[in-house]
């Protein structure tokens, strides 16, 4: 909750809508265990919104900016895709940001059935209809008539050998003047700078309540699953 001033009446507490959407705290890596490769399964889907908020610096700000960009560049009678839509939280934000009279179709794709199930619950009261499709971004996708295609921290999970093909599919799916919005974790070519970014990132996670054990175990689980590239790549 936060404080807001009522003119002439001092302060009152106001519950943030954002906090209401996060109901399950991420404790998946809290206890020592044999680390398995990270999967987007039921356990992860249940806590994923909290995991994102506490793992990615300026996550909410990036989502807000992406929604504003979509609202500006979405064209009437086209589709807006969220590739790797996970729990549907960005699609909901997008549905709230888009003008209702543009006849825009919102489509979310994800390979995880658990995530899509969670997304359907998230989007139950969406002001715009959203179509949910189970699809693997490592395989040939059937997407078209897109004025905007969004990838929020998703390309890094696509196998490196498949990324070029996926980007070509995305390009060919865009209508003239269409846009792709890519938000991604990247590595630096400068080793010292890259280490500094990693140190700052771990510090951020600790400030958000993660222990050193949680950070270490999750990092190990993501090894060879999340593979960031440099900007130049």
Label each residue range with its predicted role.
Residues 58-76:
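Conserved alpha-helix/loop element of class I SAM-dependent methyltransferases that forms part
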Residues 177-185:
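Conserved beta-strand signature within the Rossmann-like core of class I S-adenosyl-L-methionine
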Residues 21-37:
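N-terminal auxiliary segments of SAM/dcSAM-dependent transferases
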Residues 81, 88-139:
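Class I SAM-dependent methyltransferase SAM/SAH-binding core
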């Amino acid at each position: 909750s936060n404080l807001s001033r009522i003119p002439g009446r001092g302060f009152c507490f106001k519950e943030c809508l954002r906090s209401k959407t996060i109901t399950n705290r991420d404790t998946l890596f809290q206890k020592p265990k044999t680390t398995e490769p990270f999967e987007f399964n039921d356990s992860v889907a249940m806590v994923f919104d909290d995991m994102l908020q506490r793992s990615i610096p300026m996550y909410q700000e990036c989502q807000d900016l992406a929604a504003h960009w979509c609202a500006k560049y979405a064209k009437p009678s086209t589709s807006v895709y969220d590739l790797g839509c996970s729990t549907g939280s960005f699609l909901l934000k997008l549905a709230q940001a888009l003008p209702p009279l543009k006849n825009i179709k919102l489509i979310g794709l994800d390979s995880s059935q658990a995530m899509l199930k969670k997304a359907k619950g998230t989007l139950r009261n969406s002001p715009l209809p959203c179509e949910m499709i189970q699809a693997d971004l490592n395989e040939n996708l059937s997407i078209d008539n897109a004025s905007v295609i969004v990838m929020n921290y998703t390309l890094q999970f696509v196998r490196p050998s498949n990324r070029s093909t996926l980007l070509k599919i995305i390009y060919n799916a865009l209508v003239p003047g269409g846009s792709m919005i890519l938000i991604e974790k990247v590595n630096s070519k400068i080793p010292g700078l890259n280490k500094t970014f990693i140190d700052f990132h771990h510090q951020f996670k600790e400030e958000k309540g993660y222990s050193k054990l949680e950070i270490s175990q999750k990092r190990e689980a993501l090894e060879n699953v999340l593979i960031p590239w440099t900007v130049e790549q």
